[in-house]
Amino acid sequence: MDQAELSIEQVLKRDIPWETYMNTKLVSAKGLQLLRRYDKKPESARAQLLDEDGPAYVHLFVSILRDIFKEETVEYVLALIYEMLSANPTRARLFHDESLANEDTYEPFLRLLWKGNWFIQEKSCKILAWIISARPKAGNAVIGNGIDDVLKGLVEWLCAQLKQPSHPTRGVPIAISCLSSLLKEPVVRSSFVQADGVKLLVPLISPASTQQSIQLLYETCLCIWLLSYYEPAIEYLATSRTMQRLTEVVKHSTKEKVVRVVILTFRNLLPKGTFGAQMVDLGLPHIIHSLKTQAWSDEDLLDALNQLEEGLKDKIKKLSSFDKYKQEVLLGHLDWNPMHKETNFWRENVTCFEENDFQILRVLLTILDTSSDPRSLAVACFDISQFIQYHAAGRVIVADLKAKERVMKLINHENAEVTKNAILCIQRLLLGAKYASFLQA
């Protein structure tokens, strides 16, 4: 049978030769006694044994996973642990019992993530997540006990699953499910962002219809919400298509828990950086108004919708035209919005282009190098030509930034709109501002 399709029930039907393991000193006499009392017994009997002697069973199971490498036995012990924890997740505290203080209870599971078949990987991942979440807390702090390396190792495996899943249909969902519970941990957030994990979430944010895909979408959005509390992750969210995708989800989703987690994410991000401008540009005020007319039962969602609506109204009042323009450029998707051709916009805002060492001008030039969207290329060429016309040192600045070579490449572009604006840009660059009105004609 394909190991990926193995069930817990099938694995637990096996008869494991524990006596043989004792004879070869891989299981102690006491361990064998514990196993005989526990193995193949009814759930009520096993529950009583765990209540009476839980840490001893944890020690036994972890020891077997550390010392025995036979696949069938490893699967069997993982199934026993998984069954024990899924029946009562609070039993994960047993792994942190004082009697096990000198034992690395994480190591076998972390190792098996990379060594085993899919059944072994999946069960090891879920068990690790339970054990990590059950860590004892000292005051407001969680007791460490070498946990940082464990978390980093687990994050590495989770990111690997998102990039190249070990199982075609279950690899990604198990990774997202795990992350949605672990991203509460500061070390996990940090490791995940450092591993460039945030970009792996973005493609998963899209409207869903089936029960499985809705759950995956919900847990992905939950990950984004947890990351919205972490500044380095926020920087990535601001420059990716995350906001557009979340907006599409909230427009088309009828699942209350999905809508709630997206709205709570928006509420978190609204006061930060350029998110407010993005939300306005994406038409979120209208979407929020529409959502408020629906019959939601969740009070938190209703409160969040009201707060977001008020926050967006306030943001619209404060948003300058250059803020909106800057946001559009930073997202890399340009369109012929009115401001691009408004004389007043360029006269009033051309000096704003000097901010951050001409950041916006540099981004426009980067769009020329990297974008495959004809509309974005055409608008970028036009805007650079506008900067040349309206800034006193426009020609010199643009020439210093090596714009000529980049624009010249677009003169023979297959799209007529791109060609026209590339030629205009080159003419202004070569001939100067006093010919601008003549050239525009």
Swiss-Prot record:
The modification N-acetylmethionine is found at residue 1. Disulfide bonds: none annotated. InterPro entries: ARM-like (IPR011989), ARM-type_fold (IPR016024), ATPase_V1-cplx_hsu (IPR004908), ATPase_V1-cplx_hsu_C (IPR011987), ATPase_V1-cplx_hsu_C_sf (IPR038497). CDD domains: VATPase_H (cd00256). One of its GO terms (molecular function) is proton-transporting ATPase activity, rotational mechanism. It comes from the Eukaryota. Pfam families: V-ATPase_H_C (PF11698), V-ATPase_H_N (PF03224). It is found in: Vacuole membrane. One of its GO terms (cellular component) is vacuole. Keywords: Acetylation, Hydrogen ion transport, Ion transport, Membrane, Transport, Vacuole. It is a peripheral membrane protein. The keyword DNA damage does not apply. The keyword S-adenosyl-L-methionine does not apply. Subunit of the peripheral V1 complex of vacuolar ATPase. Subunit H activates the ATPase activity of the enzyme and couples ATPase activity to proton flow. Vacuolar ATPase is responsible for acidifying a variety of intracellular compartments in eukaryotic cells, thus providing most of the energy required for transport processes in the vacuolar system. Belongs to the V-ATPase H subunit family. V-ATPase is a heteromultimeric enzyme composed of a peripheral catalytic V1 complex (components A to H) attached to an integral membrane V0 proton pore complex (components: a, c, c'', d and e). This is V-type proton ATPase subunit H. The lineage of its organism: Eukaryota, Viridiplantae, Streptophyta, Embryophyta, Tracheophyta.
